[in-house]
Amino acid sequence: MPKNKTNSGAKKRFRVTGSGKIMHKRAHQTHKFEERSRSSVRRLSNDAEVSSADRKSIKKLLGK
């Protein structure tokens, strides 16, 4: 049986950690940082874990 191709868009947006979690970048990080509190800017800079509802479909896109 042939291997599944990895979805090009998904491989640019998600990464799998060593423990198996799927992480993604947070939104709203392009401009207008002077309007936001420092704490919200700092919070946005951290990666977030993908929700459990989306985990299965994203793993499929990544070919895992």
Curated annotation (Swiss-Prot):
The keyword Transmembrane does not apply. The keyword Ribonucleoprotein applies. InterPro entries: Ribosomal_bL35, Ribosomal_bL35-like, Ribosomal_bL35_sf. GO terms for molecular function: structural constituent of ribosome. Keywords: Ribonucleoprotein, Ribosomal protein. GO terms for cellular component: cytosolic large ribosomal subunit. Residues 1-64 are annotated as: Disordered. It comes from the Bacteria. It holds the Pfam family Ribosomal_L35p. GO terms for biological process: translation. NCBIfam families: rpmI_bact (TIGR00001). Belongs to the bacterial ribosomal protein bL35 family. This is Large ribosomal subunit protein bL35.
